[in-house]
Regions:
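Short hydrophobic/Thr-rich beta-strand motif most characteristic of the beta2 strand and flanking loop
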Residues: 24-37, 45
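Acidic phosphotransfer microenvironment of two-component signaling modules
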Residues: 10, 37-41
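Conserved acidic segment of CheY-like receiver
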Residues: 1-20, 54
Length: 170
């Protein structure tokens, strides 16, 4: 699981990384953690890499957490977003970006284990794959990418999200 954390407060970022690593270890979850102190750099990374979980501060200079979340949603990237902020006023505004959760910085440590358990369950369910054989070998498709399966003239057609988006054959 690839987890990215973005917060402009270097002290909080360091503390959050330590606490998150402790929670991941206690829950026996293997993850790759990457930390960013600016939203600008993270936006570039989101375009190039697949990220499973984003922990985002909201109030940051240049590019705030909402702009990052908006960019992620527009690109239809399939990552879970968790906002982490000092301002509980942002909770309702955050719904616009379909977050997985919202953590208040003042008591995030109490909630983090539960949030990570739920994230792990969701992430595990997304990893499931459908495998089938064709001439020349096997093919794997992520179940979450399958829209529907139909048949015609004794042939099976699997319609997937990438097929619809890119209009390419598998």
């Amino acid at each position: 699981m690839k987890i990215v954390v973005c917060d402009d407060d270097e002290k909080f970022l360091k503390e959050f990384k330590t606490v998150l690593q402790e929670r991941l270890t206690s829950l026996e979850i293997e993850a790759e953690l990457t930390m960013y102190s600016t939203g600008k750099k993270l936006v570039e990374v989101c375009e190039q890499e697949e990220i499973d979980v984003l922990f985002l501060d909201i109030d940051m200079p240049e590019v705030d957490g909402f702009k990052i979340a908006e960019s992620v949603r527009k690109k239809e990237l399939n990552c879970l977003i968790v906002f982490c902020s000092n301002y509980s006023d942002f909770v309702f505004k955050s719904f616009r970006y379909e977050p997985f959760s919202f953590l208040c910085k003042e008591n995030y440590q109490e909630q983090l284990s539960d949030v990570m358990k739920r994230i792990y369950e969701k992430w595990n369910s997304r990893k499931k794959e459908f495998t089938y054989q064709i001439k020349g070998g096997g093919v794997r498709i992520k179940q979450r990418d399958i829209l529907y399966i139909d048949t015609s003239n004794h042939k099976i057609f699997i319609h997937t999200i990438p097929f619809i988006q890119n209009n390419k054959k598998l």
